[in-house]
């Protein structure tokens, strides 16, 4: 995990990884647990710095069992969490959250929305009005 975080923070755009966790907020503790078990024995503080420097967003998928309704297993995005920095722990905000119906809805402003817009993100499609960070 330490090697992955180092590779992700080398300045090249675009990284993707998967990890099993029970929520988007639990991902940071899961990474820290793996890092302390690694060969490097990275302490929590150093791991948090690496996480904040390497990860921009955590996208959490969940499953909904619809077998009882004659359906199938449905996977959907339940949470999108933006990493905002570090202060003894990884600071993050849940920018999209499950609305209880299996749809992720806006939950907090995205601090890097201008960067996302430069890459093609359209906040009007999400929010109905253009929202730019100040």
Model-derived features: positions:
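Conserved P-loop NTPase nucleotide-binding/switch module
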Residues: 1-60, 65-85
């Amino acid at each position: 995990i330490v090697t992955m975080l180092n590779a992700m923070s080398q300045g090249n755009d675009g990284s993707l990884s998967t990890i099993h966790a029970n929520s988007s907020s639990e991902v940071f503790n899961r990474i820290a647990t793996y890092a302390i078990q690694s060969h490097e024995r990275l302490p929590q503080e150093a791991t948090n710095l690496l996480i904040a420097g390497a990860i921009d967003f955590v996208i959490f998928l969940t499953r909904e069992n619809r077998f009882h309704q004659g359906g199938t297993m449905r996977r959907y995005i339940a949470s999108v969490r933006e990493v905002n920095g570090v202060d003894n722990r990884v600071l993050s905000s849940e920018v999209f959250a499950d609305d209880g119906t299996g749809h992720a809805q806006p939950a907090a402003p995205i601090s890097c929305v201008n960067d996302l817009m430069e890459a093609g993100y359209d906040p009007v499609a999400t929010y109905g009005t253009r929202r730019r960070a100040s």
